[in-house]
Amino acid sequence: MASTRRSTSAAGVCARAAGESMSDRLRRYAEEGARRDEHPAITFRDGPTGRRAGLIGGPDVWEVAMWLDDLGPGDDRAAELAADGVVSRPQIDAVLAYRAAYPEEIEARIDLHRADTAAAEAR
């Protein structure tokens, strides 16, 4: 078992490397840990636009949410998306639950993607 001192030191090194204070890093760990407890199929990952929620072993939550939106109105968009085979029905259900809990976060990610895509297409 690793000592608390070594773990705290490693967290401090990681925080400094990421440009975070130790207290910011610990606050983020607590927030993400609480969200993982609430949504066990969800993890968090770094990327060029910051940290975001993603399916464990799968795409980002916002991507799956956007795919569902892009299917338009329908009786069972989740079943339709699952039939494509990219994500399973349990993964889609996990995305829907996370989106219901944190709608502003997911909508902001979708909006950012759509704005970036529109800007790239305009070039």
Segments predicted by a language model, with ranges:
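Short, basic interhelical loop/turn and adjoining N-cap
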Residues: 20-21, 82-94
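Short, amphipathic alpha-helical "recognition" segments used to contact nucleic acids or chromatin
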Residues: 58-75
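Short, charged amphipathic recognition helices of the HTH superfamily
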Residues: 21-23, 71-83
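Intrinsically disordered, low-complexity basic tails/linkers immediately adjacent to helix-turn-helix/homeobox/MYB/SANT
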Residues: 48-58, 111-123
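Short, solvent-exposed alpha-helical "recognition" segments
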Residues: 34-38, 74, 95-108
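Short Lys/Arg-enriched helix C-cap and helix-to-coil transition segments
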Residues: 39-45, 105-115
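Short amphipathic alpha-helical segments
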Residues: 1, 11, 18-31
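Short, positively charged interaction helices/loops
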Residues: 35-61
